[in-house]
Amino acid sequence: MSKITKIKGFADLFPPESDVFTRMESVARQVFGRYGFVELRTPILERTDLFCRSIGTETDVVQKEMYTFPDRKDRSLTMRPEATAGVMRAYIESGRHTQEPVSKLFTSGPMFRYERPQKGRMRQFHQINCEVLGPVEPHADAELVLMLMRFLTELGLTGLSLQINSLGCKECRPLYRKALSDFLASIDNAALCEDCRRRMETNPLRVLDCKVPGCRELTANAPTILEHNCPECRTHFDAVLRILDSRNVPYVLNDRLVRGLDYYNRTTFEVVSDSIGSQGSVAGGGRYDGLISQLGGPDVPGVGFACGMERLALMMPGADAPRPHFHVAVLDPAAQDAALLLAEDLRAQGLTGSVGFGAGSIKSRMRLAGKSGARACLILGGDELAAGTVVVKDMDSGEQETIGRDAVAARLLAAGA
């Protein structure tokens, strides 16, 4: 019978990779908690309309990348390609806006996009997302960026570049769109890639986001969106930059930064690295003041970001996994019950470890103890079972001593094992 293998673009995560993800989530909870964020868990499956209305029907995500299928009642469902839309749906449905003026929410979990798998970019990938719902002030944008940079710093990441831009608002962006469309009409459209030719008609701002070198060269002299920001948008953006300057946070003004989703307005930002291959983005986000009302909710502004966990993992410095405190080597089958009870007593006192059940020679039992990585091996054979004792062997020094079974926990704790 042939074996069943995993789907292309999906991965199984064993230690140490899974340990990196656990550490990432732990640091996220610690940092975000200092800023007053609470954790939200949303479903992996949502109605397809949610993403069409939020992300935009003309985006690459909706056009080419979503895992969409009908259920048994022929309702179109989609495995979430990003988290923000689901958070907005949950926020509206729960009536949370009636309970508190400001909501600070974070989520983590798997997302799904049908893309070409590459380094740090899989078809099932994991994100950490933060959303601030309620404030319209630029201080919310700045605080979110500061929190993101603090999170990345506490992960131990270096060599990052914060890029930032302002996409304007519904008042000034149409003027820029017209100026950009006029510019695009004046260049050799045939030299643009197929995606850019399509975007010229549906969403010309996305042409600026194209990574094809030929397209970037052709659009190098395109008008910039910052030049077309209205006074209110420029004041908002300047306030964000002023706060970042006051905290000595370095950034790069990137007037081509438009992000890949249609719901962004005003502040948009991205953190990039040149050490992880194609495109190099590890986190990004921005303001989305019209998204909640666009999904049928109240007119509540918002700002948020997402971090790609696989991409962050490529950059995280190695960290030694904590060693188990003990491993019980059972040398006599008759001692297996006592070994299990001993291990349970030790675990009840906060110690971690394993028991080597099964038959085998003393040599094989000790080899298993060595592979466990434990600091101490607790040897329990027939003689020890009869005497109520345990041989405690220090796995680093090789020294060992025989002590009473009820003294083992104190011995391990005193040794700092």
Curated annotation (Swiss-Prot):
Record-linked SUPFAM superfamilies: Class II aaRS ABD-related, Class II aaRS and biotin synthetases
Compartments reported by the entry: Cytoplasm
Keywords: Aminoacyl-tRNA synthetase, ATP-binding, Cytoplasm, Ligase, Nucleotide-binding, Protein biosynthesis
Chief localisation class: cytoplasm
Transmembrane segments annotated in the record for this chain: none
GO CC, any one term: cytoplasm
InterPro entries: aa-tRNA-synth_II (IPR006195), aa-tRNA-synth_II/BPL/LPL (IPR045864), Anticodon-bd (IPR004154), Anticodon-bd_dom_sf (IPR036621), His-tRNA-ligase (IPR015807), HisRS-like_core (IPR041715), HisRS/HisZ (IPR004516), HisRS_anticodon (IPR033656)
Gene3D superfamilies associated with the record: Anticodon-binding domain, Bira Bifunctional Protein, Domain 2
One of the GO biological process terms: histidyl-tRNA aminoacylation
Family: Belongs to the class-II aminoacyl-tRNA synthetase family.
Subunit structure, interactors included: Homodimer.
Protein's recorded name: Histidine--tRNA ligase
Lineage per the UniProt record: Bacteria, Pseudomonadati, Thermodesulfobacteriota, Desulfovibrionia, Desulfovibrionales
Gene: hisS
